[in-house]
Amino acid sequence: MAKKPRNAERINNLVVVSDLHAGCRLGLCPPTPVRLDDGGHYTASEFQQKMWSLWLEFWREWVPEATRGEPYDVVVNGDALDGVHHNSTTQISNNFEDQIRIADAILRPVVDKCKATGGAYFHVRGTEAHVGKSGIYEEQLAQRLGAKPNGLSQYARWDLWKRVGGDGGPLVHLLHHVGTSGSAAHEASAVNAELTASFVEAARWNREPPTYIVRSHRHRFIAVDMSAFNGYAGAIVTPAWQGKTP
């Protein structure tokens, strides 16, 4: 049973991961053999075992240090599954139930630990090519793992607005997609444009702008910040837990 936090409305920490691409031979996969639909098993490659060790280091060492042992919410910001896409040949299985089973094995310990601290688990839908039309397979995974639904009873939502730290705390907007660039010299351009656009839209409709925006999709981490009404605003693009594919 999840422990109720000291203040159910005040969570000071938001941990965001994305782009696990479970079901890909270069995606995240637990080291324990995973049962497939036909009764066979898949065993993680040497590369996947190395990636898994980094995943464990992140959750066992970095997260407790960064959150100072306080409750935290977890957001999976899209593309938890690899899907069947772009004529690729790197899938462990083209059966989505197999891919969902792998993602469940990856995320369930994370979700259980999050809820045990008093936090909640949220899921944002990713790319149609990976998670199905309307994010159908990511919706199934999120419901299976007990994600907190939105007002439409969607367990995997298109975006998430989250205030961190209670009343007066920073407002965060999370969405999977963001523009990309083929040039390292312009890698920050789309991210800066996304942050700027969020301020323009907020002003246009007389709404509070986000202090932070979080995006994923590009598989490369970058953070951009600028001076703002509250002193500081930032845009963060999360890295992937998948190796480079052919």
What are these regions (language model features)?
Residues 4-15, 161-173, 228-233:
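Beta-strand-turn-beta hairpins that frame and shape the catalytic cleft
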Residues 52-53, 81-155:
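Active-site neighborhood of divalent metal-dependent phosphoester bond hydrolases
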Residues 12-14, 71-74, 120, 170-172, ...:
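Structural motif
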Residues 1-98:
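N-terminal active-site segment of His-dependent metallophosphoesterases
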Residues 132-189:
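An acidic, phosphate/nucleotide-engaging active-site surface
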Residues 61-72, 105-121, 207-209:
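A structural motif corresponding to the C-terminal end of an alpha-helix
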Residues 19, 79, 103, 126, ...:
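Divalent metal-coordination and catalytic microenvironments
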Residues 167-246:
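Conserved beta-sheet core of the metallophosphoesterase superfamily
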